[in-house]
Amino acid sequence: HDRPKFCYLPADPGECMA
């Protein structure tokens, strides 16, 4: 996980962008 991105399913908190 480097840059934040939109949440995908299944998504990790570190991969979610508000």
Curated annotation (Swiss-Prot):
Full protein name: Kunitz-type serine protease inhibitor C9
Could you say which protein family the record assigns here? Belongs to the venom Kunitz-type family.
| Function per UniProt | Serine protease inhibitor that inhibits chymotrypsin.
Organism, by scientific name, is Daboia siamensis (Eastern Russel's viper)
Q: Where is it made, tissue-wise?
A: Expressed by the venom gland.
UniProt domain BPTI/Kunitz inhibitor: residue ranges: 7-18
The molecular function terms in GO held by this entry are: serine-type endopeptidase inhibitor activity
Q: Where is this site: Reactive bond for chymotrypsin?
A: M17, A18
Q: Where in the cell is it found?
A: Secreted
**GO CC annotations?**
extracellular region
Q: Mind listing the UniProt keywords for this protein, alphabetically?
A: Disulfide bond, Protease inhibitor, Secreted, Serine protease inhibitor
Top-rank taxon of the source lineage equals Eukaryota
Q: Identify the taxonomic lineage of the organism of origin.
A: Eukaryota, Metazoa, Chordata, Craniata, Vertebrata
